[in-house]
C-alpha cells in the first residue's frame, strides 16, 4: 500500500466526518 493513497483515504474520511 502506498503512503500517498493511505493519506488520501484518511483525508477523505476526515472531510466526510466534518460534513456529517
From Swiss-Prot:
Subcellular location: Endoplasmic reticulum membrane; Microsome membrane
One GO CC annotation: endoplasmic reticulum membrane
The reaction(s) this protein catalyses: an organic molecule + reduced [NADPH--hemoprotein reductase] + O2 = an alcohol + oxidized [NADPH--hemoprotein reductase] + H2O + H(+)
Membrane topology classification: Peripheral membrane protein
Principal EC category: oxidoreductase
Cofactor(s), by name: heme
Chief site of localization: endoplasmic reticulum
Keywords: Endoplasmic reticulum, Heme, Iron, Membrane, Metal-binding, Microsome, Monooxygenase, Oxidoreductase
One GO MF term: oxidoreductase activity, acting on paired donors, with incorporation or reduction of molecular oxygen, reduced flavin or flavoprotein as one donor, and incorporation of one atom of oxygen
EC code(s) of this entry: 1.14.14.1
Protein family according to the UniProt entry: Belongs to the cytochrome P450 family.
Role description: Cytochromes P450 are a group of heme-thiolate monooxygenases. In liver microsomes, this enzyme is involved in an NADPH-dependent electron transport pathway. This isozyme is active upon P.nitroanisole, aniline, D-benzphetamine, delta(9)-tetrahydrocannabinol (THC) and strychnine.
Protein name as catalogued: Cytochrome P450IIB
Amino acid at each position: 500500500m502506498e503512503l500517498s493513497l493511505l493519506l488520501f483515504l484518511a483525508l477523505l474520511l476526515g472531510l466526510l466526518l466534518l460534513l456529517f
